[in-house]
């Protein structure tokens, strides 16, 4: 029996991606737009903040989190008792229910025209993203008192994530010990000190599946040494989705950026061969760190036909 954690937003949210505050960004105006699905480091950091004991800190953000948390699986959305899962085609993101994911393995084996028609219907007819997701735009400035003008680099616009319906983010954890410590907590969630409430309950779910195709519920991290091989043979591993560079966030305790890695983004459809590929490419020097990434939520694969998960390295 696992623990299901519902993260219930209490106000509009901001889940930053890389981009708006990168070293190469210059000019008088910076802008941020929230992700729809928070990245694993955001959720693990939120849980770690509740559980953190200063005396147990190691100075390494990843080790500190994995010492506090057991394996996290996720993330997807629940609204009105229905689960919605991310599905990605390039820059396009949809939220679809499992009833329509079930048809994907058959659809992916069809001829090109039939396959494209079926995928089009998923993204434009079956997509529930716009039924539940809204946005809230805000602008912030800083005034130079001496000139009464906006300071350079301090004109800031942000598009927050808002909701048309009651929405919960869903993750699963396999640790009974921490569930009582987090259940009912009001926590900061994402950027800009947004808040959410946590609710925990028991849930039976399989975490040892073998399938031909998987949905990625969180980014699948790729070591730099394997990137050329992956991109040269991308159709062997990724059926639809997107590969991109992502930031693992900001290390507040040490006031520095966390690492940036290449990833197959959440919502992608990958083949079983990606599992053997990553296992082969992660050498002994990388294994410990990439296993820790996996523990805090990265590399979550889901069965397309039922609510069942697996990781890649463990």
Swiss-Prot record:
Q: Major place of localization?
A: cytoplasm
Cross-referenced InterPro entries: CRISPR-assoc_protein_Cmr3, CRISPR-Cmr3_IIIB, CRISPR_assoc_ribonuclease
Q: What are the alphabetically sorted keywords of the record?
A: Antiviral defense, Cytoplasm
Q: Tell me one Pfam family matched here.
A: Cas_Cmr3
Q: Do the record's keywords include Cytoplasm?
A: yes
**Would you say which domain of life the source belongs to?**
Archaea
Q: TM spans, by residue?
A: none
Q: What does this protein do?
A: CRISPR (clustered regularly interspaced short palindromic repeat) is an adaptive immune system that provides protection against mobile genetic elements (viruses, transposable elements and conjugative plasmids). CRISPR clusters contain spacers, sequences complementary to antecedent mobile elements, and target invading nucleic acids. CRISPR clusters are transcribed and processed into CRISPR RNA (crRNA). The CMR complex degrades RNA complementary to the crRNA (target RNA) within UA dinucleotides, generating 3'-OH and 5'-phosphate ends.
Record's family?
Belongs to the CRISPR system Cmr3 family.
Description of how the protein assembles with itself and partners:
Part of the CMR ribonucleoprotein complex, consisting of crRNA plus Cmr1/Cmr2/Cmr3/Cmr4/Cmr5/Cmr6 at 1:1 and possibly 3 Cmr7 dimers. A Cmr2/Cmr3/Cmr7 subcomplex without crRNA can also be isolated. It does not cleave target RNA.
Any idea what this protein is called?
CRISPR system CMR subunit Cmr3
């Amino acid at each position: 029996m696992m623990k299901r954690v519902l993260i219930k937003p209490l106000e509009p949210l901001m889940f930053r991606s890389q981009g708006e505050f990168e070293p190469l960004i210059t000019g008088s105006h910076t802008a941020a737009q929230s992700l729809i699905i928070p990245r694993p480091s955001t959720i693990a950091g939120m849980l770690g903040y509740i559980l953190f004991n200063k005396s147990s800190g190691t100075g390494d953000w990843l080790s500190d989190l994995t010492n506090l948390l057991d394996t996290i699986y996720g993330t997807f959305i629940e609204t009105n008792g229905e689960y919605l899962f991310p599905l990605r085609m390039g820059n396009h993101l949809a939220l679809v229910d499992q009833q329509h994911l079930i048809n994907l393995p058959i659809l992916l084996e069809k001829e090109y025209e039939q396959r494209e028609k079926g995928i089009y219907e998923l993204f434009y007819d079956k997509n529930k993203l716009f039924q539940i997701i809204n946005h809230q735009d805000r602008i912030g400035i800083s005034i130079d008192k001496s000139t009464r003008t906006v300071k350079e680099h301090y004109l800031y616009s942000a598009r927050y994530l808002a909701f048309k319906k009651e929405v919960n983010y869903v993750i699963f954890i396999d640790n009974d010990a921490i569930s009582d410590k987090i259940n009912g907590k009001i926590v900061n969630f994402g950027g800009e000190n947004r808040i959410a409430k946590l609710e925990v309950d028991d849930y039976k779910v399989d975490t040892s599946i073998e399938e031909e195709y998987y949905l990625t519920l969180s980014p699948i991290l790729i070591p730099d040494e394997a990137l050329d091989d992956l991109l040269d043979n991308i159709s062997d591993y990724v059926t639809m989705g997107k590969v991109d560079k992502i930031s693992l966030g900001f290390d507040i305790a040490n006031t520095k950026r966390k690492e940036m890695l290449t990833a197959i983004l959440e919502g992608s459809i990958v083949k079983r061969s990606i599992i053997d590929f990553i296992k082969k490419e992660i050498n002994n020097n990388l294994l410990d760190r990439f296993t820790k990434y996996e523990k805090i939520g990265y590399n979550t694969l889901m069965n397309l036909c039922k609510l069942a998960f697996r990781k890649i390295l463990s």
